[in-house]
Amino acid sequence: MVTTAEKTNIGYITQIIGPVVDVKFPNGKLPQIYNALTIKGTNEAGQQLNLTVEVQQLLGDNQIRAVAMSSTDGLVRGLEVVDTGAPISVPVGKATLGRIFNVLGEPVDNRGPVNNQETLPIHRPAPKLTELETKPSVFETGIKVVDLLTPYRRGGKIGLFGGAGVGKTVIMMELINNIATQHGGVSVFAGVGERTREGNDLYNEMIESGVINNENLNESKIALVYGQMNEPPGARMRVGLSGLTMAEYFRDVNKQDVLLFIDNIFRFVQAGSEVSALLGRMPSAVGYQPTLGTDVGQLQERITSTTEGSITSIQAVYVPADDLTDPAPATTFAHLDGTTVLSRGLASKGIYPAVDPLGSTSTMLQPNIVGDEHYNTARAVQSTLQRYKELQDIIAILGLDELSEEDRLIVARARKVERFLSQPFFVAEVFTGSPGKYVKLEDTIKGFQKILSGELDDLPEQAFYLVGDINEAIAKAEKIKG
């Protein structure tokens, strides 16, 4: 969505290089950096054009260089370009809930225009240091494995690492559902360089699970912003900012806790590197843009907690060729408060959510933040699982009977812990048939303490699989015995 300046400033196209367009303006009438320019009209072939470009550089001699937000097919030199006098602005507020937008804030879900008055520019400064919430607080998700082993920071940034089919989307949807029902919060989903099919699937799943209310859109709990894989790099580079702007409004004006999902943060960097060379910048390491750190920082620094509300961000991170030292994931790592790693091994065992309890980390798992009881329980769970992992080779070769009495006990408890880390999800009820469970943090800690203390050694391990709190596991065990 773009606004028009009162005194129209008109230039004309002098050069087109793929998604990059050069425009010449009259003397003393240059647009500012990040201003949106519109190109409308008809070209020589009779094609109707309606295109928005964003100013990136001032070249001198009254010329600017801009990046297009949609395809530049059909553009010719000499076409008129109008300076709107402002950056790209997107609709914000309650009217965005339940809708799908593109990078310009235009609805793309065939449900008509958005009836709201307020828009905000996508380029905004990060909150001032004095406005930030400095006391770290844990954000309860209701998912046992996350709350115990990788607690999320309110207003923090979490990286979600996982391949295809291990359950990234299901975890994202469960988090959206839980923040909506338990915290009364809203979510914004930014699909950056997503497959169109995935975006469509996600939208339909949101409707099925009730997160988007088709009858009354105002009751929905999420706004979706998509810049798909087939779109030019300009759109993929800016769609994250469009989603973030909508989230900032909920935080700053409505004073809410917001969840911001970005899938995939790597493709935001990739889009920047695609246009960087066309803008005449010298590439840096591995061909990435020299401004990589700044680009990532400008996005990440706006995702934070203020004294008014918080934006907690869950970002899917693609790791090129599994190389964690690649500049794109390495730069992202510097901003993350926690990493949730999904394991294909656990998924193949049928343990969902398939979060790797040993590979996932969080800066919040410290005794002075979460308390001694939580910290000690989490570390005891990890050391039990680590010992079980070490013993697996011996078990595979010699069998369980060759282990010492103590090790056999550790294995039995570790298998119960592993199963107790699984949990039925609300958003998966349709597929699993078992009702979803939200488990409070204190119940999670108590449950694992009971398993590790040996109190429940006589219960069968299948009683711990896909249950909520420990009382359900005990009830399930009695049913199995009975």
UniProtKB/Swiss-Prot annotation:
It is found in: Cellular thylakoid membrane. Keywords: ATP synthesis, ATP-binding, CF(1), Hydrogen ion transport, Ion transport, Membrane, Nucleotide-binding, Thylakoid, Translocase, Transport. The keyword GTP-binding does not apply. GO terms for cellular component: plasma membrane-derived thylakoid membrane; proton-transporting ATP synthase complex. InterPro entries: AAA+_ATPase (IPR003593), ATP-synt_VA_C (IPR055190), ATP_synth_F1_bsu (IPR005722), ATPase_a/bsu_AS (IPR020003), ATPase_alpha/beta_chains (IPR050053), ATPase_F1/V1/A1_a/bsu_N (IPR004100), ATPase_F1/V1/A1_a/bsu_N_sf (IPR036121), ATPase_F1/V1/A1_a/bsu_nucl-bd (IPR000194). Belongs to the ATPase alpha/beta chains family. F-type ATPases have 2 components, CF(1) - the catalytic core - and CF(0) - the membrane proton channel. CF(1) has five subunits: alpha(3), beta(3), gamma(1), delta(1), epsilon(1). CF(0) has four main subunits: a(1), b(1), b'(1) and c(9-12). Produces ATP from ADP in the presence of a proton gradient across the membrane. The catalytic sites are hosted primarily by the beta subunits. This is ATP synthase subunit beta. The gene is atpD.
